[in-house]
Amino acid sequence: MDRVSNLPDGVRGHILSFLPAKHIALTSVLSKSWLNLWKLIPILDIDDSEFLHPEEGKAERLEIRQSFVDFVDRVLALQDDSPIDRFSLKCITGIHPDHVNRWICNVLQRGVSDLDLFIDFSYEDTQEDEDMLPQEMFVSKTLVKLKIRNDRCVDWWCGKGGTSLPMLKSLYIDSDLILWGKMKRFLSSFPVLEELRMASMEWKESHETVSSASLRKLSILGTGCEDYVNPKSISFDTPSLLYLNYSDLVAEDYPLVNMGKLLEARINLIVKDDQIKRVREPNNDLLQDDAGNVVLQFGNVVKLMNGIQNIQILYLTADTLEVLSLCCESMPVFNNLKTLGIKSEEGRGWQAVPALLRNCPHLEYLIIEGLLHNVTDKCGDACDCISREDKGRSLASCPVKKVEIQGFRGTMREINMIGHFLRSFKCLKEMGIFPEEEGPTNFENPGAFEYVEKILKLYNEISNCDVYFLVWGYMRRKWTTQ
């Protein structure tokens, strides 16, 4: 410790900034020089879980809460008005909102640029359903990065003049409900915003527009409108966007999709089981235009795909594949796409996979998470689930060079599909197979690994492809072309 004590104050303050506030406090007993370092620490990380124990009785909880409040007050008092760069506060065990908001205002007044809040105002003496954060936070001139996590409802203060965070570049919100009004007006409060992540999000209106000229990275993990209802329309006017992670109930329309610079997209268009059933009904294109006609409602998803057709990397979930089955004939051509990832589920079909593969003329890398999927009469020629004359035609025309199969369970159906891929992908040079690590597999049976290895070795002899089989991070076997 003597060597550390002899370091310059600035160096010691920098070292302490990597520790939680409670651990920093322990150093203050070493000497007066360590006590004075509080003012030099530009980063504070405060976590009430290090103080509070929910299993204690009510009286004990109240006493410990007060000691936590006293500790935070003391820490902020020691720092006085010294500048602070980052303030992280995890406070989820019922601290009164007056205390929390006072701490937030303290660091705002000192010019904090990075604010990370994980809070819950479920105080025993408070009956409010909404968590009211201090108004000063919504008009800060110094905030560059803001992260809010909350299990309840957060009321986003707009005020008479509206929210104004002119320096904010990164915003992350994870809450069951955020009261903010129209999305377009909400985003106009952040003129230089570059990164936005919204989790557990519910749209306030049935017609919404995500509009930002500066946004480069966008993640929306939504739950549709109130009561889990599909939005009527969602528009994206984000001309500078490079990355999109969009997970939400599929909207009935996508009138505007302005994403000309987009490079990577992860799309999860969530559909309910009853909607899937109606999508698969025979002659569904003859159905009348009514509220229950999901074919007409979701057919406009092709507008979303048209808007992202310049991307280089695309990941699609099993639900998304089902929705895309409605627009196979109008699927855009993805001329720049190099990497395609698809996720399969046994209750969802592959009807859209052949159209996707045909419309990716420069595809190099295909990732398939799970081979097992729902077999239908529209399953297409990408798999060998149904005997057909044109089986494998979409694969033969696909230029993919590398295929990665994740979540392999060792079933005969999967083994047959792997053989189908090796025979049909004419340009394939490499295939990696990764077993399922969480769910049940056939590998629990004696001799299963050896049997799979034997079959894969036979497949390898009929292909011009290197095949490797990895088990829990270790190379189980690799066969190379001769």
Curated annotation (Swiss-Prot):
Keywords recorded for this protein, A-Z: Leucine-rich repeat, Repeat
InterPro entries: F-box-like_dom_sf (IPR036047), F-box_AtFBL13-like (IPR053781), F-box_dom (IPR001810), FBD (IPR006566), FBL60-like (IPR055294), LRR_dom_sf (IPR032675), LRR_FXL15/At3g58940/PEG3-like (IPR055411)
F-box domain residues: 1-47
Protein name per its UniProtKB record: F-box/LRR-repeat protein At3g58930
Classification via SUPFAM superfamilies: F-box domain (SSF81383), RNI-like (SSF52047)
Domain of life, source organism: Eukaryota
CDD domains linked to this entry: F-box_AtFBL13-like
LRR repeats: 122-150, 175-200, 222-248, 313-344, 345-370
Gene3D superfamilies attached to this UniProt entry: Ribonuclease Inhibitor
Organism, scientific name: Arabidopsis thaliana
